[in-house]
Amino acid sequence: MEQVPVLAEDQRNLNEFSVLHSRKAIQELDIKNLKTQIEDIVDAKNECELLDEDDGDDIPALKVGDAFFQVSLPVLLDQLEQSEESLEKQVDVLRSSMEKDETRIQELKSMLYSKFHDQINLD
């Protein structure tokens, strides 16, 4: 098969593909980390639900930044719930962004493979 010349537009498409592919890999790691944090929060909520308001000294402290604060059990559970919701929203935003990127990645793959056939590997 004859070598197909690479035009400036082809190079821009290859560069865009590379950026999107790298961003997708980073977003996948971010989602994995967020899911781990969500699991930790769910575990903490489950442990807190086993506690009684009378277990004052056994109630874990709430971490805010680098500081820990002793709060009541209902406040702690509320904060954990808010944290879980916030992380879920972050996961949703990342997934939405990944879906858009994946659509564009497939478009670029199709364009580039149609021009370069087996002279290029985008997988």
Swiss-Prot record:
Pfam families: Prefoldin_2. Heterohexamer of two PFD-alpha type and four PFD-beta type subunits. GO terms for molecular function: unfolded protein binding. The keyword Ribosomal protein does not apply. It comes from Schizosaccharomyces pombe (strain 972 / ATCC 24843) (Fission yeast). Binds specifically to cytosolic chaperonin (c-CPN) and transfers target proteins to it. Binds to nascent polypeptide chain and promotes folding in an environment in which there are many competing pathways for nonnative proteins. InterPro entries: PFD_beta-like (IPR002777), PFDN4 (IPR016661). Belongs to the prefoldin subunit beta family. This is Probable prefoldin subunit 4. It comes from the Eukaryota. GO terms for biological process: protein folding. Keywords: Chaperone. GO terms for cellular component: cytoplasm; cytosol; nucleus; prefoldin complex. SUPFAM superfamilies: Prefoldin.
